[in-house]
Amino acid sequence: MKSVYFVAGLFIMLAQGSWQRSLQDTEEKPRSVSASQTDMLDDPDQMNEDKRHSQGTFTSDYSKYLDSRRAQQFLKWLLNVKRNRNNIAKRHDEFERHAEGTFTSDVSSYLEGQAAKEFIAWLVKGRGRRDFPEEVAIVEELGRRHADGSFSDEMNTILDNLATRDFINWLIQTKITDRK
């Protein structure tokens, strides 16, 4: 983002310099005035055109001045933003705890993967045990809490797991004739 502002400021400065050079070149060229044109200078209509030209030159010079002021203000603004951003970034880094959040996220992903593997292994074994040790599972799941303190989310997960286990136990224990 800094480089975009830098390139924009550089472009404005180059454009301003090229406009100034082209205007200086046109002003420095000598104008040849023929005899017929000197006769026109006595004409009042020609005086109005000269007046308009001088007004246009003044407004052109004034607009060049305003453009240069805008470019200077823009560069000052860019420098201030850069200075302020460095101070804000330093303060922000002091309070950021990205590494801790990443660790808890990785651990919870690992634990979820392990639980899925255990469930699949249990299904493949042919439903060896018909009941779950629910008391041990509840204590174990309550012991695994995230660092961010999302207690209600964990309770919902535990309750969903208990409901799923009850449903699986019901499916296993009921006879096929009772299910119809």
From Swiss-Prot:
Disordered, as annotated region: 23-58
Post-translational modification: Proglucagon is post-translationally processed in a tissue-specific manner in pancreatic A cells and intestinal L cells. In pancreatic A cells, the major bioactive hormone is glucagon cleaved by PCSK2/PC2. In the intestinal L cells PCSK1/PC1 liberates GLP-1, GLP-2, glicentin and oxyntomodulin. GLP-1 is further N-terminally truncated by post-translational processing in the intestinal L cells resulting in GLP-1(7-37) GLP-1-(7-36)amide. The C-terminal amidation is neither important for the metabolism of GLP-1 nor for its effects on the endocrine pancreas.
Location of Phosphoserine modifications: S54, S105, S108, S150, S152
Signal sequence annotation: 1-20
Molecular-function GO term, any one: identical protein binding
Proregion positions: 84-89, 131-145
Alphabetical GO biological process terms: adenylate cyclase-activating G protein-coupled receptor signaling pathway; cellular response to glucagon stimulus; gluconeogenesis; glucose homeostasis; negative regulation of execution phase of apoptosis; positive regulation of calcium ion import; positive regulation of ERK1 and ERK2 cascade; positive regulation of gluconeogenesis
Residue(s) carrying Arginine amide: R127
Compartments where located: Secreted
Induction line: Glucagon release is stimulated by hypoglycemia and inhibited by hyperglycemia, insulin, and somatostatin. GLP-1 and GLP-2 are induced in response to nutrient ingestion.
A single GO cellular-component term on record: plasma membrane
Keyword tags: Amidation, Cleavage on pair of basic residues, Hormone, Phosphoprotein, Secreted, Signal
Primary location recorded for the protein, binned into one broad class: secreted
Residues under site feature: Cleavage: R52, H53, R83, N84, R91, H92, R97, H98, R130, D131, R145, H146
Similarity comment: Belongs to the glucagon family.
The protein, known as: Pro-glucagon
